[in-house]
């Protein structure tokens, strides 16, 4: 088999590349990663590694020089040697922040160990435990280096040796000149990476010092890196693009680097532009789905057009999935709008690569505005120096395809991995003739340039992450209405679609001409969508019911995804799709109410935009949260509606109370006409009203608001109503003056909403104590309270309450206006000022973009501070007393104590106030994060299990 002769990729349309790159590569000849590290420190000690963390709402950048980072990593390595692990031991490195991951990897290498970078673990407990057990068995043992949050996620798996970075730091000392780092050989294992596990449990990709060096040399030459270059990365460090492509490759050439947690950019898209300007960034990386999202979000910041100096940026690499040409062009146009130089040009370089190829190995950098792309997706171009590619017949894996004809893409070169760890069978099957790596992708090479045309493997890529079709199908098969073993899911991408999706084919258990077919089909499709969203965060593009007698299986009894997709693309399933739409239309028609007033129609268009629906499909009876609305969407709806209706403010709580279009329209009309009287205070805020199981009432945390519960409430759709209890005072009402007054008001609100028990009530943090008091009052009225959930709060809280200054700073921290450390450092100096002066200082220090995002004015912020202060004052005089029938206590990692001390010395005291034995349940995350986006899916499962265990 003869590979296609391709010249290495070169950089087009900019002056970043110079002869200095090749001269530097020649001058420096490291043969291991530690050579790269020590050479960079020696030649460029003052060059920088900078970081923006997930908690840096204030845009602060933390920086270490190469020299400082070297000392830090060596100190960690010195402490690591005390573990007594044999040289070559595998250490699983598990962090979310770039700096932690980076320091851990270099410390492992310096100490003679092999780091294995672990991506974020699944929130599905069974899958997570299965994965961790698989990794442990693969390595024969498992040492995990992580933080307290990571340790909490894996604590239930037996046999793990869990080491904390905080403990390693505590033992680390300044290392003297006599410290001798490990001296590896070029072919030793360097870093291990996990595949996505898209076809089962993850495989472990072994990269040696030699493969990584070959890749980084070639990447640096392609990118035109020099010691004067400055790069920015916002891909996770556990991904080869984040660690090899955007850290080790620039380090090889001595380039300064900025690593930004993706949440920091998504929270404030303009930060991407500011960082490019402030740090004079020349090279950046962003996958296709982030390019698309960044474009959409930045387009809303038109007031910043022409405000940024973006002249430094020379190239933006993109990969992870096919890059839509229109997306790349829209992104480049958006950057041009923001640039001070109206003639600025931007090179977007789509790339192909896998974990097995050290990320990108084929590139096509072009100025997409100057050279319009020829195809729907950007071409992927030509391979890096040393890499070869070929297209072959996928049936035999050997016969070359002619130019312009699609087939299986294979690559070979020194940057290709050497093997899968402890998996010779998978290694052998991944190579042809021992050298050509089978990527599993279908591609076309035409006139020397490659472009992708599909995939052989059974995976779907959502936002750059691969998900296994087989595992998704396993869960979809459990849906009522699906005939067992007659369901298939297949990846699919419509023309112009920004990211890949999938289609579900299945045979229903009921006849499609039966009288109740519309209702049954609607319920089945809704359940299939719910499972899909919970499994892979994306609903299917199409669900196609096919009668059993028309769903053909192979001789081995399997459905052919390829055949089904081909039938779908060729229009052969159009009659089934039309029949399903007809039945679903009948089902929807039973409840569909066309928006009638202009306000309803405007809100209908807004709902359609937020949830990517056809305007004609939006009913006046549609509920914002049942459509999938989350806490971020609430803020978006609030902003857009205020703009469309030219209103100074629509209260967030009113959106929560009026999520149905017709109801919200009436409220908006009352604001527009200015004849709406202020509603009487009602603490009960309905977040979810579907189904008829016992409702859950959740009391607000210490800041008084209930937005923290919006994402949690979504998981109770079609199961039970979910009500939040919100404090008095946000609309100008008088504050509560005691815990008794507050609890009595909430108990009365719960009784108005649900006149009779049994009740289920819970509260997070401060709200847990209030929930306990509400439950006592309900029981004293003769009602049964079958569930009382207390989330991470002890019974005695008086000494935990903040004074006014600390309360104000704590609120600012929780709102993302400053870090916890900054809040603690600021407290002493603020206490010397009056309250008015303290607030003025705090307001000036708050990042404007975050204030805008929260739509906070000085008046609203000050009022919120007084509300939180009022709650704190109620807590200062509170002493628990009496008892309730049951208690379920949930606890996370505390800010200061160990989890064991937090449980045993504080939380277990709830036993003194319960007439039965309380249950104590561990939940993932820290106190401040246990209900955030990363943890809420895990928390809800534990919480719902507890409700069911109480017979609810």
Curated annotation (Swiss-Prot):
Entries under Pfam families matching the protein: AMP-binding, PP-binding, Thioesterase
Keyword Cytoplasm: no
Gene Ontology molecular-function annotations: transferase activity
GO BP: biosynthetic process
Region spans: Thioesterase (TE) domain: 695-939
Alphabetical list of SMART domains matching this protein: PKS_TE
Spans through the membrane: none
Residue numbers bearing the O-(pantetheine 4'-phosphoryl)serine modification: 631
Carrier domain segment(s): 594-672
Lineage: superkingdom: Eukaryota
Region ranges (Thiolation and peptide carrier (T) domain): 599-669
PANTHER family: LONG-CHAIN-FATTY-ACID--COA LIGASE, SURFACTIN SYNTHASE SUBUNIT 1
Cited function: Inactive atromentin synthetase homolog. Does not accept 4-hydroxyphenylpyruvate (4-HPP) as substrate. Both the adenylation (A) and the thioesterase (TE) domain of the invA6 enzyme are inactive.
Annotated family: Belongs to the ATP-dependent AMP-binding enzyme family.
Full protein name: Inactive atromentin synthetase invA6
Organism: Paxillus involutus
Record lineage: Eukaryota, Fungi, Dikarya, Basidiomycota, Agaricomycotina
């Amino acid at each position: 088999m003869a590979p296609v002769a391709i010249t290495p990729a070169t950089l087009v349309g900019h002056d970043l590349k110079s002869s200095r790159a090749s001269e530097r590569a020649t001058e420096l000849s490291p043969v291991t990663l530690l050579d790269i590290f020590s050479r960079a420190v020696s030649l460029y000690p003052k060059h920088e590694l900078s970081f923006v963390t997930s908690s840096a709402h204030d845009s602060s950048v933390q920086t270490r020089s190469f020299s400082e980072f070297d000392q830090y990593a060596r100190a960690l390595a010195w402490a690591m040697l005390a573990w007594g692990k044999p040289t070559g031991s595998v250490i699983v490195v598990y962090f979310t922040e770039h700096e932690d991951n980076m320091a851990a990897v270099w410390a492992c290498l310096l100490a003679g160990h092999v780091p294995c970078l672990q991506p974020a673990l699944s929130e599905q407990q069974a899958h997570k435990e299965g994965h961790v057990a698989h990794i442990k068995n693969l390595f024969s043992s498992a040492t995990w280096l992580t933080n307290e949050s990571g340790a909490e996620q894996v604590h239930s798996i037996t046999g793990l040796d869990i080491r904390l970075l905080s403990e390693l730091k505590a033992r680390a000392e300044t290392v003297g000149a006599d410290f001798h780092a490990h001296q590896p050989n070029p072919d030793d294992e360097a870093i291990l990476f996990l595949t996505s596990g898209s076809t089962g449990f993850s495989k472990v990709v072994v990269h040696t010092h030699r493969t990584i060096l070959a890749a980084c040399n070639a990447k640096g030459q392609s990118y035109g890196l020099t010691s004067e270059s400055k790069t920015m990365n916002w891909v996770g460090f556990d991904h080869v693009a984040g660690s090899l492509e955007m850290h080790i490759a620039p380090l090889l050439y001595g380039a300064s680097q900025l690593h930004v947690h993706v949440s920091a950019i998504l929270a404030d898209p303009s930060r991407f532009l500011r960082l490019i300007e402030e740090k004079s960034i020349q090279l950046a990386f962003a996958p296709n789905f982030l390019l698309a999202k960044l474009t959409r979000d930045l387009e809303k910041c038109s007031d910043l057009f022409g405000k940024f100096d973006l002249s430094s940026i020379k190239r933006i690499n993109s990969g992870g999935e096919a890059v839509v040409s229109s997306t790349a062009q829209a992104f480049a146009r958006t950057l041009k709008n923001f640039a001070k130089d109206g003639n600025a040009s931007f090179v977007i370089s789509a790339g192909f690569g896998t974990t097995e190829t050290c990320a990108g190995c084929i590139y096509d950098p072009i100025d997409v505005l100057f050279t319009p792309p020829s195809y729907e997706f950007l071409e992927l171009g030509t391979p890096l120096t040393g890499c070869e590619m070929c297209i072959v017949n996928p049936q035999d894996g050997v016969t070359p395809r002619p130019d312009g004809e699609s087939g299986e893409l294979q690559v070979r070169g020194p940057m290709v991995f050497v093997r899968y760890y402890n998996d010779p069978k998978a290694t052998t099957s991944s190579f042809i003739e021992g050298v050509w790596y089978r990527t599993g992708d279908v591609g076309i090479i035409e006139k020397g340039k490659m472009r992708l045309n599909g995939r052989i493997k059974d995976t779907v890529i959502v936002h750059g992450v691969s998900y296994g079709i087989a595992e998704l199908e396993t869960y979809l098969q459990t849906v009522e209405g699906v005939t067992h073993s007659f369901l298939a899911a297949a990846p699919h991408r419509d023309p112009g679609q920004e990211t890949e999706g999938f289609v579900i084919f299945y045979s229903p258990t009921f006849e499609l001409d039966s009288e109740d077919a519309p209702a049954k089909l609607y319920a089945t499709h809704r359940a299939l969508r719910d499972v899909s969203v919970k499994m892979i965060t994306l609903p299917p593009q199409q669900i196609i019911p096919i009668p059993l007698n028309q769903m053909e299986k192979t001789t081995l009894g399997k459905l052919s995804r390829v055949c089904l997709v081909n039938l779908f693309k060729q229009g052969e399933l159009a009659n089934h799709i039309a029949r399903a739409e007809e039945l679903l239309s009948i089902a929807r028609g039973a409840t569909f109410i066309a928006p009638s007033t202009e306000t309803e129609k405007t809100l209908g268009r807004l709902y359609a935009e937020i949830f990517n629906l056809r305007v004609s499909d939006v009913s006046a009876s549609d509920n914002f949260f049942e459509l999938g609305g989350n806490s971020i969407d609430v803020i978006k709806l609030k902003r857009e509606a205020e703009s469309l209706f030219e209103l100074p403010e629509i209260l967030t709580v009113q959106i929560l109370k009026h999520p149905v279009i017709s109801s919200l329209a009436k409220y908006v009309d009352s604001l527009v006409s200015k004849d709406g009287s202020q509603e009487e205070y009602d603490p009960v805020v309905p977040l979810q009203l579907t189904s008829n199981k016992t409702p859950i009432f959740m009391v607000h945390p210490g800041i008084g608001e209930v937005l923290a519960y919006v994402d949690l409430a979504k998981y109770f759709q079609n199961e039970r109503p979910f009500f939040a209890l919100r404090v008095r005072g946000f609309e100008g009402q008088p504050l509560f003056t005691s815990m008794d007054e507050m609890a009595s008001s909430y108990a009365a609100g719960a009784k108005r909403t649900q006149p009779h028990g049994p009740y289920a009530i819970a509260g997070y943090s401060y709200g847990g104590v209030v929930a306990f008091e509400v439950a006592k009052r309900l029981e004293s009225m003769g009602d049964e309270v079958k569930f009382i959930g207390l989330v991470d709060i002890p019974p005695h809280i008086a000494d935990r309450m903040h004074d006014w200054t600390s309360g104000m700073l704590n609120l600012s921290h929780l709102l993302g206006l400053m870090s916890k450390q900054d809040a603690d450092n600021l407290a002493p100096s603020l206490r010397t000022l009056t309250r008015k002066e303290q607030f003025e200082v705090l307001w000036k220090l708050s990042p404007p973009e975050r204030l805008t995002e929260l739509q906070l004015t000085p008046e609203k912020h000050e009022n919120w501070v007084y509300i939180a202060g009022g709650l704190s004052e109620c807590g200062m005089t509170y002493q628990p007393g009496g008892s309730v029938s049951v208690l379920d206590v949930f606890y996370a990692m505390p800010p200061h104590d160990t989890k064991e001390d937090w449980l045993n010395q504080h939380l277990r005291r709830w036993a003194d106030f319960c007439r039965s034995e309380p249950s104590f349940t561990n939940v993932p995350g820290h106190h401040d994060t246990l209900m955030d986006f990363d943890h809420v899916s895990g928390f809800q499962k534990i919480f719902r299990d507890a409700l069911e265990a109480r017979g609810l």
